Amino acid sequence: RLQHPLAAKLRRVLRVDSEGDTYFAQTDGRCPFLCVEGLCELQRTLGEQSLCRTCRDFPRWEVLLCDRVEQGLSLACPEAARRLLERSAPLRFVSAPLPDDGYVPGVRERRLTAAVTAVRDRVLALLARPGHTAEENLAAALDFARAAQRQLDRHRIAALAAGKVPAVPADALPEPETPAVLAAAFASPEPLDARWPEWLRRVAALPACPPPRMTAVQQTCLAQAIVWRHGMDALDDRDVVFPVQYAAATLRLLACLAAVSDRTDAQLVVLVTREVENDPEALSRLRAGLQIEPKMNAQEARDDEKM
């Protein structure tokens, strides 16, 4: 019923999946309404009211955690990636009170959320330590996360929430994955970008991961953004180590991609983020590719009564 020059295009690309949800058929991994300058043709022509909820919210993400709401920006958005990499200092995370909605979380939920939050806060602080390289800070964050994981595996939730984790060992650079391992771990059976498999093949052919092209601050901000977004996943899988490993692997892959492609750092961040965020199985494949065993699946986490 839309009477507009875009109506014919809209009808042509609109699809309905088996569950009755509508979506746009993509072309070379791109939304058919995404202009070359990265703007939405629908929004630019018809206004924000024409967007679906997914497009209206993007690149914002929001997660309800116990008695708070966390928000952030997806680095799949070119503007979000550009702004992140233009920062001259590590990220700062801002909190503000929300209106009381009457929800009262249970004791176990509060305890576990407090524990995982404390671990993530410490990891974020370690990633931003002044006077250290980004690699050294990643190593320290990984050492701490592994120590915290031992506490979590032993159900020492109160100790974690109170920050009582064994002293972090002396800095030691993490053992780097080879380019071939990284390429296999980030491979996708249904890539959004048709060039993704070829770039990963080029990465796999590298003899070693090259030095990062990004600055230390850029590496820090990117690692912080990944840990901020995924650090609380441990509420489901009980794994506080994987978000740090994911951040480290992403930084190494970006260094490799910078050596084999003509993309800018911001473009590469967008590329990698889109390939991961738009595939619900991507993180599971990445975990398997990096030979990381999941601590607990979501159902086991809910059934765990030792909290």
Predicted regions: what they are:
Residues R11-C52, L64, V69:
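Immediate flanking context of iron-sulfur cluster ligation sites
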Residues R302, K306:
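Short polybasic linear motifs
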Residues L6-K9:
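Glycine/small-residue-rich phosphate/adenosyl-binding loop
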Residues A128-E300:
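Hydrophobic, aromatic-lined core segments that form the binding pocket/scaffold
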Residues G38, T45-N137:
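Internal, well-ordered alpha/beta segment that forms a basic, Gly-enriched binding/recognition surface
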Residues H4, A25, L34, Q49, ...:
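Generic alpha-helical scaffold signal
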